[in-house]
């Protein structure tokens, strides 16, 4: 389970980072931004369904420190 959770967290963070990158580049189309936002929301939705929001936020804080 730990490996699956790690994969989910890393995937979600990657999708989030990509969303931020796309949003910071004005040449990207609104459609591309929305498509990336949907990918992030899908990944984060799995975290929500598994009631892992607290664990994910702690993991993000640890990665950022």
Regions found by a protein language model. Give the residues of each.
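N-terminal acidic leader/helix
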Residues: 1-34
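Short, charge-rich amphipathic interface segments used for partner binding and complex assembly
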Residues: 24, 29-65
């Amino acid at each position: 389970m730990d490996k699956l959770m790690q994969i989910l967290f890393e995937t979600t963070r990657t999708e989030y980072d990509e969303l931020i990158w796309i949003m910071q580049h004005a040449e990207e189309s609104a459609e591309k931004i929305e498509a990336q936002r949907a990918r992030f929301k899908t990944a984060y939705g799995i975290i929500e369904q598994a009631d892992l929001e607290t664990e994910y936020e702690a993991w993000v804080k640890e990665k950022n420190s």
